[in-house]
Every structure is written in structure tokens, then in C-alpha cells.
């Protein structure tokens, strides 16, 4: 088996985790306490043992780890409807939180907890026959997500160097912010994890708020609405690991097809169709329509305009009632559209995946039940605008050295700030260079 261990760090990581495992149990016909129902699609297909391990009593337990430096969020899981799904030992909480401070999560408070966490990771790994890799869910802006998330990735890199490490990161939104020091935490965590993470799927809250408001007509989206939408994306990405399909995509294949250079590993996620229950009956939702709507900025999980950039690689993951003939026709149609530009050194650029299991529907959720859906993961140079926005906010704060004393007081050196900022400047430059046409790049090289 090719197992995957999911690690959910901090409030954002844990709450996205709740939405994901809720959806996985529905997809595989598991009850909230981890037992297979009689009409479950997974009765004859053991593919989902990549994400669940079976106990001797026939119960299925998620291969997951919940970690937070303060107890409140995980206590909700311990007392919630899925409390008997998770193994109690895979929920680790500290006594005091990281207070939105990267340095607390990474150095002071994080140091006390990291060995406990790595011990639990080792137990989960020992329980696997052929571990494929790790999924780490965290936010960039919080203290635990940024600091402790980075620390865990560093340790995973040391202990399990050859295994894939994929991140699912909540990126700071352009105008919404959950804390003043978000830019600091985000720049520091990106700098630390850049060399340790193989592929990082980003979502930002503002983009998802807008999707909930525009496509799903939710006047005031709450975190549950956002997380359930993110869970659909995660589920689409992992579906081919959990179900059989006519064109399966492996964890390593994501990297091979989406990451042209090690540092440029931040694909954009887009989901289609995102339709509310009252609109669903009026839409045909053909493969071509779905594919086309994935290239619309309105369906994207990060605020940036792909029309301003060029695509380097693109993975189209279909689920449900889809045949290869339709997907090939849809891709051929996309290639004729002039608005979608690929870099000239990567002419083909499309990777397809098809999973036969239709998308699941959360009872009482916002999304309508559909026969087919798709998720597009695209590595585009447009995402560099998100980095430059973040860097600008960092510069405004750092020019006055505002709030820096909180970080230095937790044992960080001020030099780390400038080092991290330089690394991100280099990342912006990397994106600029890969987006250049080969001819322009040669001219520029000649000038040096």
C-alpha cells in the first residue's frame, strides 16, 4: 500500500482537517466512529487504506495527527461528533499558545512539544507498509501554523528525507487579516520551509469568501463554509490515492508534473463546478464547461489574476462521470484560446487524472450534489503577485522595526528577518525569470 500521513497544525490546520475527514468518511461510507456501512463503495476497494488504518475489531482510524500549542480547538474535536473516529493519542495539545508569534511556535514553545510530535509521527509511519509521504496542513499567518508547522517540516525532512512532503497552506489574504504580524510570520515560515517542502498548495481566505458569496450565495460565510470548500479541493487532490480510477495520479506525480524547478513549487488550486443547491438544476456542467471555468479567476483559491502570468504546468483532476475522450477534447479547446498562455519552454503542459468515484455531498452543506467535478492545479507565474503583495506588507512593518521585539524576546535574531526577506525577493526574481521567453532570457544573459 502507498500510505499518506496527514499532519494538521494549529487552528487553521485542525479545522481544515475536521472538514477533510468529515468528507472522507462520507466518501468512503464510514460512520462517524469509523465503521464501514453495508452499502459503502469501499466494501470491495481497499484503496482508502492509504488514509485509514484498520484495527483488529474492523474499525477504521485516520492516519492523521492533530497538533496545536493550545487546547481549545482540538478539545472541540475531542467532544465533537467525530470524537470516536480519531485515536486519542493522535491529538496533541500544549498548555500555552504561540500568540501569533512565529518565534514562539518555532523556538520557545515549539521546542518543548516537537519530540512528542515526532514520536507520534514515527508510530504512524511504523504502521505503514509503504509510506508515500506526508500532507501538512497549516496557516502562514498564525504563530503555531507558521512557527511550529515549519519546525515539523524541518524535522520531517531530517527524519524522512526521501518521502514526499506536501503542504496545504492558508495564505494571508490581500485585505482580510487575522493578526497584525501576519506578514512577518508568513515571510519567516516561507523562508524556512522553502527547501523542505516539495509542493505547497495555497488557499487564501479572501478568495474563498468571495467564492462563497458569489457562487454559493452565502451572505455571511463562516469558517465551516470556507473549510468545507477547501476540503473539496483536498479531496479532489487525494481522490486518486483513495479510489481506483481510469487515470490515477500518485503523490510523486504531482511534483513531477507541477514543479519545474525545486523552489517554484506553489501551484494554484481551482475547483469547478461550484454551484449552490438552488442553481444546480439549471446547469449542464459538461466537461468542457467545467474545464473552461477552471481558468476563470473567480474559481481560484488564491487572489491573483492568471491572465497576467504564464502557465508552466497544469494538472486537471476529474472525478465522476468523465471519459478520456471528453477531457482530451476540452484540453484541445483550451489550447486554442489565446487568453491562456504557456511559457514557451513547456509547450504541452497538461497532466490529466480521472477518478471514477463521483464527488461526495455533505448533508446540509452549501455545494450541490453533482455527477462530476474537477480540480485544476496550475503552476503559474501569476502567483508571484501574491508574493510581492506579502513582501510589501512586510517591508512597511519592518521599515519601522514594528513588533520585532516580540520575536527577538523569544530568542530569534533580527538577522533572520532580513535573511528571510532576501530569500523571498529571490523567489520573486525566480518567478520573473521562468516567465521570460527563452529569447529574452538569452538577451539578458548576454548583457551580463
UniProtKB/Swiss-Prot annotation:
Q: Which SUPFAM superfamilies match?
A: Tubulin C-terminal domain-like, Tubulin nucleotide-binding domain-like
Per its record, the protein catalyses: GTP + H2O = GDP + phosphate + H(+)
Quote the catalytic residue positions. 253
> Pfam families this protein is in?
Tubulin, Tubulin_C
Where GTP binds, per the record, is at 11, 70, 139, 143-144, 178, 205, 227
Cystine connections: none
- Any GO molecular function: structural constituent of cytoskeleton
Alphabetically, which GO biological process terms does the record hold?
Answer: microtubule-based process
Q: Where in the cell is it found?
A: Cytoplasm, Cytoskeleton
Which GO terms of the cellular component aspect does the record hold?
A: cytoplasm; microtubule
What's its EC?
3.6.5.-
Matching Gene3D superfamilies: Helix hairpin bin, Tubulin/FtsZ, C-terminal domain, Tubulin/FtsZ, GTPase domain
Question: What's the top EC group for this one?
Answer: hydrolase
Q: Which cofactors is this protein said to need?
A: Mg(2+)
Residues annotated as binding Mg(2+) are 70
Instruction: Report the principal subcellular site.
Output: cytoplasm
Q: Taxonomically, which superkingdom? A: Eukaryota
Kindly state the subunit structure of this protein.
Answer: Dimer of alpha and beta chains. A typical microtubule is a hollow water-filled tube with an outer diameter of 25 nm and an inner diameter of 15 nM. Alpha-beta heterodimers associate head-to-tail to form protofilaments running lengthwise along the microtubule wall with the beta-tubulin subunit facing the microtubule plus end conferring a structural polarity. Microtubules usually have 13 protofilaments but different protofilament numbers can be found in some organisms and specialized cells.
Protein purpose: Tubulin is the major constituent of microtubules, a cylinder consisting of laterally associated linear protofilaments composed of alpha- and beta-tubulin heterodimers. Microtubules grow by the addition of GTP-tubulin dimers to the microtubule end, where a stabilizing cap forms. Below the cap, tubulin dimers are in GDP-bound state, owing to GTPase activity of alpha-tubulin.
Record protein name field: Tubulin alpha-1A chain
**Species of the source:** Schizophyllum commune (Split gill fungus)
Q: Which gene encodes it?
A: TUB-1A
Amino acid at each position: 500500500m502507498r500510505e499518506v500521513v496527514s499532519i494538521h497544525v494549529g487552528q487553521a490546520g485542525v479545522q481544515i482537517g475536521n472538514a477533510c475527514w468529515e468528507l472522507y468518511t462520507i466518501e468512503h461510507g464510514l460512520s462517524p466512529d469509523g465503521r464501514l456501512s453495508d452499502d459503502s463503495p469501499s466494501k470491495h476497494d481497499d484503496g482508502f487504506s492509504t488514509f485509514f488504518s484498520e484495527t483488529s475489531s474492523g474499525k477504521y482510524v485516520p492516519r492523521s495527527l492533530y497538533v496545536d500549542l493550545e487546547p481549545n480547538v482540538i478539545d472541540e474535536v475531542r467532544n465533537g461528533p467525530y470524537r470516536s473516529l480519531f485515536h486519542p493519542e493522535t491529538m496533541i495539545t500544549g498548555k500555552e499558545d504561540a500568540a501569533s508569534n512565529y518565534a514562539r511556535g518555532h523556538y520557545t514553545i515549539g521546542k518543548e512539544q516537537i519530540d512528542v510530535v515526532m514520536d507520534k509521527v514515527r508510530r504512524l509511519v511504523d504502521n505503514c507498509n509503504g509510506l508515500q509521504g506526508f500532507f501538512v496542513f497549516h496557516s502562514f499567518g498564525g504563530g503555531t501554523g507558521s512557527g511550529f508547522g515549519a519546525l515539523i517540516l524541518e524535522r520531517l525532512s531530517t527524519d524522512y528525507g526521501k518521502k514526499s512532503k506536501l503542504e496545504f497552506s492558508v495564505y494571508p489574504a490581500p485585505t482580510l487579516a487575522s493578526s497584525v504580524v501576519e506578514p512577518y510570520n508568513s515571510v519567516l515560515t516561507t523562508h524556512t520551509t522553502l527547501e523542505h517542502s516539495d509542493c505547497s498548495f495555497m488557499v487564501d481566505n479572501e478568495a474563498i469568501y468571495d467564492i462563497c458569496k458569489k457562487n454559493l450565495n452565502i451572505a455571511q460565510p463562516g469558517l465551516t463554509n470556507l473549510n468545507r470548500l477547501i476540503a473539496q479541493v483536498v479531496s479532489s487532490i487525494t481522490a486518486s490515492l483513495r479510489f481506483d480510477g481510469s487515470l490515477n495520479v500518485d503523490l510523486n506525480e504531482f511534483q513531477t508534473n507541477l514543479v519545474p524547478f525545486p523552489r517554484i513549487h506553489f501551484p494554484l488550486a481551482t475547483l469547478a463546478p461550484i454551484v449552490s443547491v438552488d442553481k444546480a438544476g439549471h446547469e449542464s456542467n459538461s466537461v468542457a464547461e467545467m474545464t473552461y471555468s477552471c481558468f476563470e479567476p473567480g474559481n481560484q483559491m488564491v487572489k491573483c489574476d492568471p491572465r497576467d502570468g504564464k502557465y508552466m504546468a497544469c494538472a486537471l483532476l476529474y472525478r465522476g462521470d468523465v471519459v478520456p475522450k471528453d477531457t482530451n477534447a476540452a484540453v484541445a479547446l483550451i489550447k486554442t484560446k489565446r487568453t491562456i498562455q504557456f511559457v514557451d519552454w513547456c509547450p504541452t503542459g497538461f497532466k490529466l487524472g480521472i477518478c471514477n468515484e463521483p464527488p461526495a455531498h455533505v448533508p446540509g452543506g452549501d455545494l450541490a450534489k453533482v455527477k462530476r467535478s474537477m480540480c485544476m492545479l496550475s503552476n503559474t507565474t501569476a502567483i508571484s503577485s501574491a508574493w510581492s503583495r506579502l513582501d510589501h506588507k512586510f517591508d512597511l512593518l519592518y521599515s519601522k522595526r514594528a513588533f520585532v521585539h516580540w520575536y527577538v524576546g523569544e530568542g530569534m535574531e533580527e538577522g533572520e528577518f532580513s535573511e528571510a526577506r532576501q530569500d523571498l525577493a529571490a523567489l520573486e526574481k525566480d518567478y520573473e525569470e521562468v516567465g521570460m521567453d527563452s529569447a529574452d532570457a538569452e538577451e539578458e544573459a548576454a548583457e551580463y
